[in-house]
Amino acid sequence: VNKRIKPLVLIATAVLLMAGCETQAGSQAHIKLKSVEEQREILETYTLDDYKTIYENVPDEANRLEKDQDLQKWVIRTLAEEKLLYDTDLSDKQVKALAKEAMEKDKLWKSIAKKKYGVIASDAEIDRYIEEGADTSGLPQHLAIAATLNMSLEEYNHGFDRDIYEKAVIWQKLKPKLEKKYNTTNNEMLAEKFDEEVEKNYKK
């Protein structure tokens, strides 16, 4: 997991679990996060209404910044993460740059998993993963971002955030291959090793 948000990774958008995080070295080196204590307080005390207040302007801001639907999704995620986790106020240019980098690295991550390791996730596998996990979630931050986007939780999970869950399924299948390659079962180390593979192949 990216060390910037490892302490309380679940308070970012959607799941942003290990398989959903991207290392954005360089682009975010200057960004200051809220302290671990502040993040913990958010996680432990924020209600559904608190999250809705945080997210309420995200869709309009994203629509102003980016019209392309694929990239706009990542702009929404970047804005949501900024409002929840960052002490640094991002400029429009920074938001768009971070969103573009995250989208490109996500595609590259999946491409390497497929082409180098032969790992993909089927629609059935993704649906099952979501149905057994995210669809049963009552986490207020998930409900709030879905409501902000005028979606039900199921629509949000199976539609908007489907790519994140696809990545989680791929990781489950990819991990045993990486364990053999790197001779370790340490999840964080494996994630870092694979992120290094992505970074080596990423062209800005």
Question: Positions of the model-derived regions?
Answer:
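Cell-wall glycan
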Residues: A147-S152, G159, Y165-V169, L174
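N-terminal targeting/tethering segments
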Residues: A29-L153, N157-H158
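A C-terminal, polar beta->alpha supersecondary segment
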Residues: Q24-R64, I164-K204
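Bacterial N-terminal signal peptides that target proteins for export
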Residues: N2-L8
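C-terminal motif of bacterial Sec signal peptides marking the signal peptidase cleavage site
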Residues: L17-G20
